[in-house]
Amino acid sequence: ELISNSSDALDKTNNSLTIIDSGIGMTK
């Protein structure tokens, strides 16, 4: 459970970073 929870948190963080990156790319 701990491992899966950690990976889920990493996935959410990666998804957020990807969305932010794409947003910055669109504004440029």
Swiss-Prot record:
Binding site for ATP: 5, 21
Domain of life, per lineage: Eukaryota
GO MF entry, a single one: ATP binding
Compartmental location: Cytoplasm
UniProt KW keywords: ATP-binding, Chaperone, Cytoplasm, Nucleotide-binding, Stress response
UniProt keyword annotation of Chaperone present: yes
Any Gene Ontology CC annotation: cytoplasm
Matching InterPro entries: HATPase_C_sf (IPR036890)
Known partners and oligomeric status: Homodimer.
Free-text function comment from the UniProt entry: Putative molecular chaperone that may promote the maturation, structural maintenance and proper regulation of specific target proteins.
Family statement drawn from the similarity comment of this UniProt entry: Belongs to the heat shock protein 90 family.
Name of the protein this chain belongs to: Heat shock protein 81
Organism, scientific name: Pseudotsuga menziesii (Douglas-fir)
Lineage: Eukaryota, Viridiplantae, Streptophyta, Embryophyta, Tracheophyta
